[in-house]
């Protein structure tokens, strides 16, 4: 972005209408910024004055981007990927959007997503499946599918999304881009539709780590309107200090139990990675982690996240806001009205997950399921954070396999194992994690490298990710 490789004018001169066509064809787009005259067919003309009056002091001046459609934008339709909010116009804007606007970034659209973020494939939006940027028969990953696609296809140089389990990092792995989830609370969640507030993070997609650092300087700010907001010790230092060399030897760790599950492609690439690090005289420490604990990560995640989600969206009644069924000749009470509206306008997958959350938090089941899940989460977090007493960074593949087919996902075939589930620990702990391009078998068969760090070590994490990008030539076309 700093070198103007991907300027607004270059993007729009090349494909002013094609952007809209491409986004629509793969269901990556939900809503253009129509109410603010951000129609793409007119964007070159509308922004030409801004471009001519560009101010280099504004960090993201004239840089286009997209927002995941669960981030509120005042008077611009924000759906959360759900028919329930098909025409919803928020009366407020999210803090992260306001920060981007203040720094000159130009919103060109809202990106499709799994309904309210409850999905890991990009297949569960009311507005259609988002397919892989290189293969229409494969998934893009989710829930931030449209956001990843827009960056992968060079439609925009960066996008803002959310990550509750691995919703940024898994699509980044599948789409061969960089996906960054900072420490919990460093990017404000004010104005962001919740999924599971104890695990929700706002994060960034880009093609390069340097661009992630630039955007981080804009959006990582303490926000008094967000009770969970935390102040970073490195505000405004992410880009300027990105290439500063480390003054001491870095200790890398990896989970030894995961290696047994690597397929042949992963094993070969992983062996090469270990060999290269050792040749560079970096410590690579095998770490033990109870396999039985790894096996329960996904179950614990589902119990807690679905339970929090059903609470967060209890306000979806269709009475105060949202879609509603009009049956004037069919009188009904409050409960019947809500039931009818939810049945009509919420997706089947979302309703299934809400049922699980409601079951786990029912008075009869609360202690048996939800409270027990919270206790196990605490054990998982303690074990995970203890890893950083021995190492500075934990490395792992960002996925166990290449992108699944849309057909397999729709047939409910399993597509993850504990290699994938490991990414969820960073959400449990609130620690920073990043996925960078790594294993490229073909353009539609990629797996990222996941790098995790301790809480508030975000600057160091970006520095080491940048180092990997340079050392292993992980930049991509």
Swiss-Prot record:
Assembly description: Heterotrimer of A, B and C subunits.
GO molecular function: ATP binding; glutaminyl-tRNA synthase (glutamine-hydrolyzing) activity
EC annotation from Swiss-Prot or TrEMBL: 6.3.5.7
Entries under PANTHER family matching the protein: GLUTAMYL-TRNA(GLN) AMIDOTRANSFERASE SUBUNIT A (PTHR11895:SF151), TRANSAMIDASE (PTHR11895)
UniProt name for this protein: Glutamyl-tRNA(Gln) amidotransferase subunit A
Gene3D superfamilies, A to Z: Amidase signature (AS) domain
Top-level taxon of origin: Bacteria
Protein task: Allows the formation of correctly charged Gln-tRNA(Gln) through the transamidation of misacylated Glu-tRNA(Gln) in organisms which lack glutaminyl-tRNA synthetase. The reaction takes place in the presence of glutamine and ATP through an activated gamma-phospho-Glu-tRNA(Gln).
Presence of keyword ATP-binding: yes
GO biological process, one term: translation
Assigned protein family: Belongs to the amidase family. GatA subfamily.
Keywords: ATP-binding, Ligase, Nucleotide-binding, Protein biosynthesis
């Amino acid at each position: 972005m700093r070198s103007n490789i991907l300027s607004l004018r270059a993007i729009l001169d090349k494909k002013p209408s094609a952007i809209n066509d491409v986004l629509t064809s793969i269901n990556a787009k939900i809503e253009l910024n129509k109410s603010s005259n951000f129609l793409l067919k007119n964007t070159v003309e509308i922004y030409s004055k801004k471009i001519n009056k560009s101010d280099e002091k504004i960090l993201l001046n004239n840089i286009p981007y997209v927002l995941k459609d669960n981030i509120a934008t005042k008077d611009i339709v924000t759906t959360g990927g759900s028919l329930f909010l098909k025409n919803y116009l928020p009366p407020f804007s999210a803090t992260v959007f306001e920060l981007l606007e203040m720094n000159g970034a130009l919103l060109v659209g809202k990106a499709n997503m799994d309904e309210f973020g409850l999905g890991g494939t990009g297949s569960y939006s009311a507005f259609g499946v988002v397919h892989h940027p290189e293969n229409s028969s494969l998934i893009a990953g989710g829930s931030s599918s449209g956001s990843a696609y827009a960056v992968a296809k060079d439609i925009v140089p960066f996008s803002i999304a959310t990550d509750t389990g691995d919703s940024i990092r898994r699509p980044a792995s599948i789409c061969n881009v960089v996906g960054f989830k900072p420490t919990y609370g460093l990017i404000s969640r004010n104005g962001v539709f919740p999924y599971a507030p104890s695990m929700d993070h706002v994060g960034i997609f880009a093609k390069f780590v340097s661009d992630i650092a630039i955007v981080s300087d804009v959006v990582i700010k303490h926000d008094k309107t967000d009770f969970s907001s935390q102040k970073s010790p490195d505000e405004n230092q992410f880009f300027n200090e990105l290439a500063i060399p480390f003054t001491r030897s870095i200790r890398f760790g990896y989970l030894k139990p995961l290696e047994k599950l690597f397929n042949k492609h992963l094993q070969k690439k992983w062996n090469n990675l270990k060999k290269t690090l050792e040749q560079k005289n970096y410590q690579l420490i095998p770490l033990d982690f109870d396999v039985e604990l790894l096996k329960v990560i996904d179950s614990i995640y589902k119990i807690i996240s679905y339970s929090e989600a059903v609470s967060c969206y209890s306000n979806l009644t269709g009475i105060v806001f949202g879609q509603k069924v009009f049956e004037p000749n069919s009188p009904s009470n409050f409960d019947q009205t809500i039931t009818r509206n939810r049945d009509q306008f919420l997706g089947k997958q979302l309703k299934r997950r809400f049922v699980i959350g409601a079951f786990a938090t029912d008075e009869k089941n609360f202690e048996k399921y939800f409270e027990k899940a919270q206790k196990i989460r605490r054990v998982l977090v303690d074990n995970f954070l203890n890893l950083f007493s021995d190492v500075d960074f934990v490395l792992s593949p960002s996925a166990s396999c290449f992108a699944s087919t849309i057909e397999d996902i729709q047939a409910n075939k399993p597509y993850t194992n504990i290699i994938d589930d490991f990414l969820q620990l960073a959400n449990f702990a609130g620690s920073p994690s990043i996925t960078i391009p790594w294993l490229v078998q073909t353009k539609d068969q990629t797996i990222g490298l996941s790098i995790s760090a301790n809480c508030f070590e975000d600057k160091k994490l970006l520095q080491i990710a940048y180092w990997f990008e340079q050392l292993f030539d992980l930049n991509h076309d």
